[in-house]
């Protein structure tokens, strides 16, 4: 069932009043929380789940191919209505997480849906008990049913790890007071934090944005204030992480999952060895990527050692003028149009139809995401737009997701959903198109240098930083398996990966050890973060193919996006002559970043 299929931005620093910033119009989902359509859908959903259970529980093995197709289509229809309701409740909540009414509405909807859909738990379990030969026979008898084979393959990949029907129903029922409740506690705590910087009270999003201000004293004040507030709340955040890691360990143990990462790899439809090859390639490249770049940046900033508040500092030669919303829109749409007019046309709808919520507001969820909602409606994009060049890239990134989600919707609800590893492809590609357009338009070497440095920095944040995050999670879950972790122990794990990834030029201020505590991915989606590095590496390799002048590239690229979750990564990449399971594949993507750092170093001579 659709729970939370937001696709997050890896390093968004987001939002403010830069022209007329758009707000969502959620009426394409429902007119309001008491809309008659919503009540009707809840009633329909409840009855449909009962009917589905009555018609199919204990009977799947007896169905012929046509009957099996009917069952799949009925399940898909239920999935759409459940997804529509939760999308509406979730998006309203993200607009104002501090509103108790919105929080209650989301929680009540989650409770109702969980209660109704518990009756469907049997379906996946019973389906997985079908004999392989019998299933193959059914698929060969009905082409419409055979279209769903990728969905069945993913379901059956879970077969070795499924529990008894009764246990599965219990876990499904109990989830609302388990991980979901701790997620909500985290979200509401983060949204309620207040950071006082230069006499101004700010939410987290606006506070972290100060870390990329031109003025060094402002950056330092922001870093120290963030550290102070996080420190005050560390015991609560440590409790959240301890509980969620233990919750995961218990379920993994019962399911006999070999590692804490297995569940994520299965849902990403990617093999552990592919992720391992990616992780090892990135860690081996730390010295020639992040260490080398930050040493160069220290020189530009005139510093012997970098402090943590210098990591995202703009260059001294950087123009700190802000980009208004209209200019940002024009920049991204024209970059998309040069690659493909169709891509720009799809993206344009997000602006004209109120599918974007862009302003920073008190109580609004931090960060940026694209939410696909359901295939019968359309995606929504959330930003916290503050007019920085980074925010323009975030817009390009999230619109890439949006375009991907619109195109993949043609597959229908069950086949449209793209695993995270491939979901980042269109977003990072959208960023790359926007960057290349800006780079081509650079009028002076200085402008080119600023753009290159910005892109390298963004790639380091997407690749190096996210793999360091992945290592942090791996170490955290391994340590938690040995017993409860104190805040100091979690802090120590964080500092070990930060030191390794950022390199010797950094000195870490007292208090930086708590900065793990505000990163939502660790809480919402364990081991999600390697998907960013996967996506970046993949796009760099794809972009190299595009630059080599493949005349059919656009057509192949659109086919890849339209495929949604209907193909495995090996099948999707084959038309481009790429293979992610080859360890050398990742070096190809990393060498693009390295080449940009080479160019920056050459500019010093």
Regions found by a protein language model. Name each.
Residues 17-20, 27, 33, 123, ...:
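C-terminal, non-catalytic "cap/extension" segments appended to globular domains
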Residues 1-318, 603-605:
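A well-structured
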Residues 414-426, 458, 487, 525-532:
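Active-site metal-coordination segments of metallo-dependent hydrolases
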Residues 320-325, 375-396:
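Short pre-active-site segment immediately N-terminal to the catalytic Zn-binding motif
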């Amino acid at each position: 069932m659709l729970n939370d299929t937001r696709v997050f931005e890896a390093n968004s620093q987001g939002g403010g009043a830069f022209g007329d910033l758009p707000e969502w119009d959620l009426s394409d989902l429902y007119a309001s929380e008491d809309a008659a359509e919503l009540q009707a859908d809840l009633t329909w959903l409840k009855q449909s789940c009962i009917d589905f259970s009555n018609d199919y529980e204990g009977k799947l093995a007896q169905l012929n191919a046509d009957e099996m197709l009917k069952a799949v289509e009925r399940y898909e229809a239920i999935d759409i209505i459940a997804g529509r309701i939760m999308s509406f409740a979730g998006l309203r909540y993200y607009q104002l997480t501090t509103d108790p009414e919105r929080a209650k509405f989301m929680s009540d909807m989650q409770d109702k849906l969980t209660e109704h859909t518990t009756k469907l738990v049997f379906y996946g379990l019973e389906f997985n008990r079908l004999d392989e030969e019998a299933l193959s026979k059914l698929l060969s008898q009905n082409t419409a049913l055979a279209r769903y084979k990728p969905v069945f393959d993913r379901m059956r990949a879970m077969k070795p790890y499924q529990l008894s029907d009764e246990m599965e129903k219990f876990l499904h029922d109990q989830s609302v007071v388990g991980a979901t409740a701790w997620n909500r506690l985290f979200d509401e705590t983060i949204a309620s934090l207040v950071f006082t910087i230069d006499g101004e009270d700010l939410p987290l999003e606006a506070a972290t944005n100060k870390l990329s201000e031109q003025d060094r004293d402002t950056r330092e004040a922001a870093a120290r204030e963030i550290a102070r507030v996080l420190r005050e709340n560390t015991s609560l955040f440590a409790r959240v992480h301890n509980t969620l890691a233990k919750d995961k360990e218990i379920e993994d143990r019962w399911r006999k999952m070999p590692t804490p990462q297995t569940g994520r790899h299965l849902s990403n439809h990617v093999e552990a060895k592919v992720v391992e090859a990616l992780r090892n390639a990135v860690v081996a490249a730390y010295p020639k990527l992040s260490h080398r770049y930050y040493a160069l940046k220290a020189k530009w900033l005139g510093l012997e050692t970098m402090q943590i508040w210098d990591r995202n500092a703009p260059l001294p030669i950087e123009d700190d003028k802000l980009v208004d919303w209209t200019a940002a829109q024009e920049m991204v749409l024209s970059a998309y149009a040069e690659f493909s007019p169709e891509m720009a046309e799809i993206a344009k709808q997000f602006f004209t139809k109120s599918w974007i919520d862009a302003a920073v507001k008190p109580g609004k969820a931090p960060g940026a995401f694209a939410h696909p909602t359901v295939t019968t409606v359309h995606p929504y994009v959330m930003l916290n737009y503050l007019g920085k060049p980074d925010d323009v890239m975030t817009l390009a990134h999230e619109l890439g997701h949006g375009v991907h989600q619109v195109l993949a919707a043609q597959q229908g609800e069950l086949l449209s959903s793209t695993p995270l590893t491939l979901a980042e492809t269109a977003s990072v590609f959208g960023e790359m198109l926007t960057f290349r357009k800006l780079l081509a338009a650079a009028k002076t070497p200085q402008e080119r240098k600023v753009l290159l440095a910005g892109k390298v920095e963004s790639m380091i944040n997407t690749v190096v930083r996210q793999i360091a995050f992945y290592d942090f999670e791996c170490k955290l879950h391994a340590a938690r398996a040995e017993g409860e972790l104190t805040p100091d122990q979690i802090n120590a794990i964080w500092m070990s990966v930060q030191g390794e990834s950022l390199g010797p030029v950094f000195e870490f201020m007292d208090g930086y050890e708590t900065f793990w505590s505000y990163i939502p991915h660790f809480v919402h989606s364990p081991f999600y973060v390697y998907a960013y590095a996967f996506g970046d590496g993949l796009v760099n390799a794809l972009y190299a193919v595009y630059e080599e002048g493949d005349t059919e590239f656009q057509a192949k690229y659109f086919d890849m996006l339209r495929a949604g979750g209907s193909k495995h990564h090996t099948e999707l990449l084959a038309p481009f002559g790429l293979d992610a399971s080859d360890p050398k594949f990742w070096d190809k993507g990393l060498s693009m970043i390295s080449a940009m750092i080479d160019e920056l170093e050459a500019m010093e001579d």
